[in-house]
A protein has these predicted regions:
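Long, low-hydrophobicity, solvent-exposed regions enriched in small/turn-prone and acidic residues
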Residues: 1-205
């Protein structure tokens, strides 16, 4: 299944300061498309196109693979003419231990499983890492611990870095910095580890 949207803008008319009529052609066209290829694969993209120069102005293309719960990986390409050109890798994946959802009758016991989640952007123009988030999550069944590092570029040679630590008592409360929100905002398809045990489900399509 897929969708395609095309949004042209209106033609504008005006008068120059010396009284001469002027007609501005159509401004950029915005195209957007998304496709759910099968149960595991998604793809989407947007393109801003200038009909006067017959060149793209901005574009984003992304493909995502999600074979199961708490398993997602995506790659993206971002382009802004004369400004930036980036590639991006984002993920959420189990790395060690038995997930709570696989323990059957013992799913309420406090065992442990480790997950990694994050997003890394690389500038093809500057040949360096730009914005990035990397984190680890430990799901003990009755509580979840999140640890992460967020790095934001504020200039070609300047960055801001912060460390996040959060403890979630499943079904009760969360303590510490909001690492959950940062991961949810940065990782396409990210799913909260306790979503099947909490009153609210946090799934990002």
């Amino acid at each position: 299944m897929g969708d395609l949207h095309l949004r042209p803008r209106q033609r504008l008319n005006g008068i120059t300061p010396d009284g001469q009529p002027v007609t501005q052609r159509f401004s950029d066209l915005l195209l957007a498309a998304a496709a759910h290829l099968d149960e595991r694969w998604w793809a989407d993209g947007t393109l801003e196109f200038n009909p006067e120069t017959n060149r793209s102005v901005r574009s984003v293309m992304r493909a995502r693979y999600s074979p199961g719960p708490f398993r997602t990986m995506s790659v993206a390409y971002r382009f802004a003419r004369a400004q930036s050109e980036q590639v991006e890798l984002a993920w959420q994946w189990p790395i060690y231990g038995t997930p709570v959802t696989s323990r059957g009758a013992n799913s309420n016991s406090c065992g442990g499983a480790w997950y990694s989640a994050g997003r890394v952007q690389y500038s093809l123009r500057d040949k360096r890492l730009t914005d990035s988030v990397a984190g680890f999550e430990y799901d003990a069944g009755c509580w979840v611990m999140r640890f992460g590092i967020e790095r934001l570029s504020t200039g070609r040679a300047e960055t801001n870095t912060r460390i996040m630590l959060q403890l979630e008592l499943v079904g009760l409360s969360q303590l510490g910095s909001n690492a959950l929100k940062v991961l949810r905002d940065n990782v396409p398809g990210y799913r909260r580890l306790s979503s099947d045990r909490s009153p609210s489900s946090d799934f990002t399509p």
